[in-house]
Curated annotation (Swiss-Prot):
The active site is at 381 (nucleophile), 507, 509. One of its GO terms (biological process) is 'de novo' CTP biosynthetic process. It comes from Synechococcus sp. (strain CC9902). This is CTP synthase. Pathway: Pyrimidine metabolism; CTP biosynthesis via de novo pathway; CTP from UDP: step 2/2.
Amino acid sequence: MAKFVFITGGVVSSIGKGIVAASLGRLLKSRGYNVSILKLDPYLNVDPGTMSPFQHGEVFVTEDGAETDLDLGHYERFTDTAMSRLNSVTTGSIYQSVINKERRGAYNGGTVQVIPHITGEIRERIHRVAANSGADVVITEIGGTVGDIESLPFLEAIREFRGDVGRQDLAYIHVTLLPFIGTSGELKTKPTQHSVKELRSIGIQPDVLVCRSDREISEDLKRKIGGFCGVPNRAVIPSLDADTIYAVPLTLEEGGLCREVLDVLQLTDHESDMTAWSQLVHNLRNPGPSVKVALVGKYVQLNDAYLSVVEALRHACIAQDASLDLHWVCAEQIETEGADALLRGMDAVVVPGGFGNRGVDGKIAAIRWAREQRVPFLGLCLGMQTAVIEWARNQAGLPEATSEELDPGTPHPVIHLLPEQQDVVDLGGTMRLGVYPCRIAPDTLADRLYGEQVVYERHRHRFEFNNAYRSLFLEAGYVVSGTSPDGRLVELIELKGHPFFTACQYHPEFLSRPGRPHPLFRGLIEAAQQRLPDSPAQAIRNQGEVTTP
């Protein structure tokens, strides 16, 4: 039977509950326990698929095609365990389910209320994750902050959950902030005390407190917090600001988080093996020479909009003993200032996914610059589509070529709507989503990078390469290096004679892991390193033995 851990947050939002949940998952897994983590989000959207990246950050796609919160990306990267649509729950999806049941007569004419119907549906979702995952421990992160009206049904549900499984089978963790007041020169505990008081008023007594701070927490302060909040001193776990999120599991392990949780759950505290993780953090903190990578996008004002892309680049740099020098480049700014002005000196260019017209011309200009300057390039989803448009306009003699998404009346729709999308009206959850196989062509860059004939990648798109133009592209020097198994859908393209130029219709960033970088990202960083002044390839170029065509 599974055990359950519930993680709440207080004092401020964005306090790091997701990283705490992911870190605890990593620590439990290092002791041999199977873990699944789910997120309860208190917004009324059914899922974040149609939400603006400026408001929500990236949409993380699971293997089974769910559009979810970016925290699920943290869960997967830290635990190296695939999550599913069951691991993402929103208030909107709960209400939708309950209302649908009411319409079907499932409640036998009863009055449908928040308690017990909404809270009961929430509890059922948590039990479902336990049953389907086979996990020893199910960790649940409750979004929002204690005191928010939106979170109340979720908090009531996890209070009721105690009656479902028994007190020895669940643990409550509360993440709070200890602010430092400069004038008094001390960390203040009052916000934490009030947050715990609010949680207690709902009927939840936390077993463990994770206290965020920017400096060391003294033993006296831990005793004070423990005394006022009703938890043992040893269960007050410091969580100091870290230089990298991958160091957080090590900090929490040192503070005793996993030990305390296992004690509450009455589980054996097996010996932990965090050797590989510690080495990973060491390598991250002691990198080799830096590579300059330009990320050209339309949402660069909010870094979380491309979170998995950035993490995938970091993973590749760790594996290649490189330091990531990431440059955020606004695609619209390229349209006004020119690609060379903003990209000169870059060792690699990445154009990630996105939707809509805004910034597309800037992305196309960036891709042309990378192609002509022979700078390593990787395009993702819309990044592949814009690479196709760039080639069509500048190399294939189709100056009016574009995507049907951008101009439905274009005479040359080199990117067009997927056939199965023709009659789709709703936006939410209707794209080509989730894992699909991709057949890799032999003797290509992709073949060298993957080393496999068939790979499985996660997708999120409505548009595809228009096969009416495939012959024209192949004749002009394009290489289709990956397709769907039936050969119809173009999944991966590359250019001959370029140091590294490839783009894919899928999202490889979702499969990258700290200790196992995705082959496309690792290949990009490896190619970027060849441009560094002391690389063998650069030395040969400097001697004039390699000339640019």
